[in-house]
């Protein structure tokens, strides 16, 4: 996942 990608954390903004």
Swiss-Prot record:
Protein name: Putative large ribosomal subunit protein YmL1
Its biological purpose: Putative component of the large subunit of mitochondrial ribosome.
Top-level lineage group: Eukaryota
Residue ranges that the Swiss-Prot or TrEMBL entry lists as coiled coil: none
Ubl conjugation recorded as keyword: no
Record keyword Methyltransferase present: no
Subcellular location: Mitochondrion
GO CC terms: mitochondrion; ribonucleoprotein complex; ribosome
Main location: mitochondrion
Keyword list, A-Z: Mitochondrion, Ribonucleoprotein, Ribosomal protein
């Amino acid at each position: 996942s990608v954390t903004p």
